[in-house]
């Protein structure tokens, strides 16, 4: 990684989280001159027996990106593969079972901690001579002048770039400074996350039960424990947080129908508010948005981070093609190719997740009957089920 003395870059990435570091790694491998701006220094000094409460279901497509930049090997020891997924409805007998063996594949994906991914990516980026990491650094303002974005940092430093990328999350300062409006709506729900130990092993299976108040997921971890994500109406989520550990474990086991036996113990619990949000535009002259800066979806299908990594792959491919054709990587016509490729896909996933939330949150009898019938029909249709699995795996 270069010492951050140069002030003129091909690409400046605001945001050194998972998505921003992934983009920096891909572009750095292709010898673009890149600066990554991150507001806080990451703390990767954690006890080895601790588990990050933020975990992601990493698809095969996202895994391929990590392998391509050389980061996967550092993640692998704490990656939990899952070959099966079981989904069922609390309001009836609807049940569906996905099994990677039906596709001749060893697994559907991996569950990985956020900090494990970020640490591996940071180690890759640190070895790339064309990438500079500025930390702490925060964008104060930027202005388009000629063929550069001129970026002023809060500490007074100035940078210039052919392209500024906002990878700075759902409250993106880059998006705000660019005047790009984001439409947001609150789901009225919160996701309660924790790490739990169960009586029976998770068997490398991801589990999800649709409750009237929101979905409950058990995700397998590398050490035999499970990460749980319980999306619930805000009042219920707060009541669950107020329970002591024993009562919470009992409530969790009951809500999960004891599919893995008793819940024996749990870690600390945290709440994250749920909302959906999408930027009206992904690009402007010499500016692009990726990841949560451009779209936030319900975690129901665990696709949020994978959508962000699809953004990374598409934007990197767009910039590489432009460079190969000797075109300006910051030109709006070039960047609109990226927007066309990703905006429709992200919006489609958002509306699908909204539809699932409405469908499985309904207690209206005809809808309950229809969704249970639908789950069972899909489970009995191998061709359709295999198509769903391939799409979810990113194949």
Each model region followed by its residue ranges:
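N-terminal glycine-rich dinucleotide-binding loop that anchors FAD/FMN and/or NAD(P) in oxidoreductases
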Residues: 51-76
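C-terminal helical "tail/cap" subdomain of flavin- and related membrane-associated enzymes
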Residues: 317-395
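N-terminal Rossmann-like FAD-binding beta1-loop-alpha1 element of flavoenzymes
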Residues: 10-36
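Conserved N-terminal helical subregion
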Residues: 5-8, 67, 78-177, 185-190
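Short FAD-binding loop at a beta-strand-to-alpha-helix junction that anchors the flavin cofactor
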Residues: 283-299
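Conserved FAD/dinucleotide-binding core of flavoprotein oxidoreductases
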Residues: 211-273
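Central beta-strand plus flanking loop segment that forms part of the substrate or channel wall
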Residues: 61, 171-206, 222-226, 233-236, ...
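Glycine-rich FAD pyrophosphate-binding loop
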Residues: 28-51
